[in-house]
């Protein structure tokens, strides 16, 4: 068999996470397998620093050299929609439009209809799937079940009231424990808790029915969450490490026995369970507790998705689309990686494959993330908010919570100031889009220091 004289190159840009650079390796291997299956193509995977990713894509777009496929983090959905090519047209096209109703592309079965429902909903705008989920996570509760049962609690708490009761029982049982529960002061958890209550962070249905013009840190749902959080801390039940985005610090507090419960990303299920085993206790993984007074409206996701460049010639476009389907076929979409961190599989077929192989029987702690997402109703709340300057805006809320917990600032007054700061950041982004173009690489969104230090994969 002769090699084609000139191969069609498909450039793929993925995020490089400073502490976990090996996460790109499985995708490179899958791209190499795609190249063997389709010798007329050469898929090239490049890793770009996560903090610089949107800016680098914007600069490449301005130069006319943007990648054919770009993996945007969920915090940059608005930027991905706003970026333009040198002629001022949107850089990306929807995957739905590009697929055009086909059932397979270059022999690769199209998997759009098999994507887990709320993942598909999260990346759907105006009825079209804008981008393909690449990895997905949610937020879960990790419980030292040995400590809970010793305190007379048979099962992990599922509501805020049950968390309070569990913390009180733990405090009465073991006065040496620093607190009953811990979690990082991070924007994604604010967003989850607001969504669980059916609340919104922005107008126009969280930016889903139109561009967000107003952010809301003063909603009843937000104030209910941060008030409950503050009160847990005041009662000595919540352990704050004193640092924002301190995922590792909270995980260590849980592993060391300083807290009997931990709220954290589903990506960390493997490391958390292994750390607990090493420490000599059992972990039970369950859904993220919700506000029983508001009822349960669902949880949202985080992660990355693959965006397809518009205006490609047909062979390049179809090669890129075929690669997207290949990366999400049942085997590749299982997303079980050697480094021990696990994303939620992106398709129902991949979940079924793992189940048929007995993987969940051997690793039951990975199942709650799937169960939580499957029971989450589709709504503007659970689709999550979309707005520009996402990272600085969420950082404003994190700083406000820090000031409430550490300095005892008045909660309502402090979050009112944070709301004003967040609104200013949103207005700055809107002015930037209006006065320039989103492809100049000089937009106002910058990764705050707390974000630069984080090493979350899906969060």
Sequence positions of predicted segments:
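Glycine-centered hinge/linker elements that transmit conformational signals in sensory
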Residues: 167-168, 208-243
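Hinge/lid segment of periplasmic solute-binding proteins
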Residues: 77-138, 193, 282-286
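Short helix-initiation/N-cap motifs at beta->coil->alpha
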Residues: 47-56, 160-162, 241-255
């Amino acid at each position: 068999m002769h090699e084609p004289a000139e191969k069609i190159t498909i450039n793929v840009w993925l995020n490089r996470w400073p502490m976990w650079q090996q996460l790109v390796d499985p995708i490179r291997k899958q791209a190499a397998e795609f190249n063997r299956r389709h010798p007329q193509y050469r898929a090239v995977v490049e890793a770009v620093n996560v903090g610089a990713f949107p800016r680098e894509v914007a600069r490449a777009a301005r130069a006319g050299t943007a990648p054919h496929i770009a993996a945007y983090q969920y915090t940059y959905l608005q930027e991905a929609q706003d970026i333009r090519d040198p002629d001022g047209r949107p850089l990306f096209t929807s995957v739905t439009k590009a697929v055009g109703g086909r059932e397979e592309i270059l022999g690769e079965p199209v998997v759009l209809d098999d994507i887990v429902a709320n993942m598909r909903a999260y990346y759907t705008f105006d009825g079209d799937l804008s981008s393909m989920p690449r990895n997905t996570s949610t937020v879960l509760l990790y419980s030292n079940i040995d400590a809970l049962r010793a305190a007379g609690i048979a099962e992990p708490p599922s509501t805020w009231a049950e968390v309070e009761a569990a913390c009180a029982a733990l405090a009465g049982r073991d006065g040496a424990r620093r607190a009953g529960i811990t979690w990082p002061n991070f924007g994604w958890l604010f967003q989850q808790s607001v969504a669980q209550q059916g609340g919104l962070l922005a107008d126009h249905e969280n930016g889903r029915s139109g561009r967000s013009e107003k952010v809301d840190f003063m909603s009843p749902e937000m104030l209910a969450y941060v008030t409950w959080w503050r009160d847990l801390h005041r009662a000595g039940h919540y352990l704050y490490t004193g640092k924002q985005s301190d995922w590792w610090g909270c995980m260590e507090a849980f592993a060391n026995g300083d807290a009997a419960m931990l709220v954290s990303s589903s990506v960390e299920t493997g490391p958390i369970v292994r750390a607990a085993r090493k420490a000599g206790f059992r972990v039970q993984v369950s859904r993220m507790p919700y506000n029983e007074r508001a009822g349960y409206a669902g949880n949202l996701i985080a992660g990355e998705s693959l965006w397809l460049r518009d205006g490609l010639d047909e062979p390049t476009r179809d090669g890129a689309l075929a690669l997207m389907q290949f990366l999400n076929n049942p085997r590749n979409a299982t997303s079980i990686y050697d480094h021990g961190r696990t994303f939620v599989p992106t398709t129902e077929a991949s979940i079924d494959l793992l189940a048929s192989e007995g993987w969940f029987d051997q690793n039951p702690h990975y199942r709650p993330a799937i169960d939580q997402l499957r029971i989450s109703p589709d709504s503007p709340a659970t689709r999550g908010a979309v707005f520009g300057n996402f990272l600085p805006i969420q950082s404003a809320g994190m700083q406000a919570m820090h000031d409430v917990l550490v300095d005892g600032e008045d909660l309502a007054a402090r979050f009112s100031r944070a709301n004003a700061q967040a609104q200013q950041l949103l207005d700055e982004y809107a002015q930037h889009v209006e006065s320039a173009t989103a492809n100049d690489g000089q937009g106002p969104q910058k990764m705050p220091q707390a974000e630069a230090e984080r090493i979350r994969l899906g969060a």
